[in-house]
Amino acid sequence: MLSGVLGGVLFHWLGGLASGSFYVPYKAVKKWSWEVYWLAGGFFSWIIAPWIMAGLLTNDLIPVLREGFSANPKACCLGYLFGMLWGIGGLTFGLTLRYLGMSLGMAVALGICTVMGTLIPDVYARTIIENIQSQPPYCVILLGLGVCLLGVIIAGFAGMSKEREMPAEEKKAAVKEFNFTKGILIALVSGFFSACMAFGIQAMEPVAEIAAEHGTGDLWVGLPKLCVILLGGFTTNFLWCLYLMLKNKTLYQFGTTTIQDPDQPGQTVKINYLSNLFFSALAGTTWYFQFFFYSMGETRMGEYKFSSWTLHMASIIIFSSLWGLVLHEWKGSSRFTKALLGIAIGTLLYSTIVVGYGNLMKEISAEPAAAVAVEAVEGEAAAQAVSEAVNQANATLDDLLEEGAAIEQQLEETVEEVLEEAN
């Protein structure tokens, strides 16, 4: 199995691929309303897949979670709460795109999410200034974060250039509700709440430690955390989707193969229920694997686990942009616009390399220190062995001296007896 920082970067790329790809199967879902297929996929994203994978790959899942709630209820409650807040971030992301447009909305929301998810844990722990002053690898990771933000900004410019080149009717539809002030405020909310996933993962670290105590391999110890955090995310999404289904009268679509045709009001249409369910399940399971690989990658990042969030966000934007090219979403755009997109993807890719290099620097710098520690331990052990040998030798010498004194005394007594007999 891949080990070290390079393995961690690869796992985060795989997580980004899963996140950037999960929506593709939803395109095969026909006639279901958004809230119906989103919740159908959500059951697999937030309930079924997390518990199945954690149950298969970890030891004593239920006892671990029970022990976690008993030993550290605050950590588990925070994990669930942050999961709920993360769910709000995902739902408000749609409003961000509505008021700022696809390109500017994604650039602002994802940029805020990247910065907050990466830095706030260290800001909260009050270690960021100390780390900047004393740890060069930490500064390299912050440089990687800056490069990632630059890539997000360039991607935003590419998106705005694409929107300017759209046909007049499409452009009007895309910006008809544009509201910069409202959009920026919602983007701040969305970016912060979306970053709560990173906070939840960190808050539930005690559960990962308990999983390790139960014999779970270090690569899988983060999976039980996801069961709790994603349950919080499911709660938020379930309540919102249920509200929409009651409002739009679409709840019935879950249990029938004949529904009202959304394209022709007043008409009914038959749907392939199993096909819709299959592709929703495929999309939901694919979505889950972003955090499955995230939890694996985090275990390989060493002391700087916080950098996992930067790698995760950069990888998502890279692969979602590539899918946009594959699905011809950039068809008709100018060479300049496509060049901007290419530069954005390249910049984001470079940011993952910079962040990975910073972690690698820390890993390499830790090896000599570990070697010195081992030598010190070995030296101490050797000194202790010598000391024990000297003590043993002294004890043996004392025994010999005692025996010699006893023999000398016995000889004196024997000589006295012989002399007495001779007289």
Where are these regions (language model features)?
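Polytopic alpha-helical membrane proteins, predominantly small-molecule transporters/carriers
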Residues: 1-423
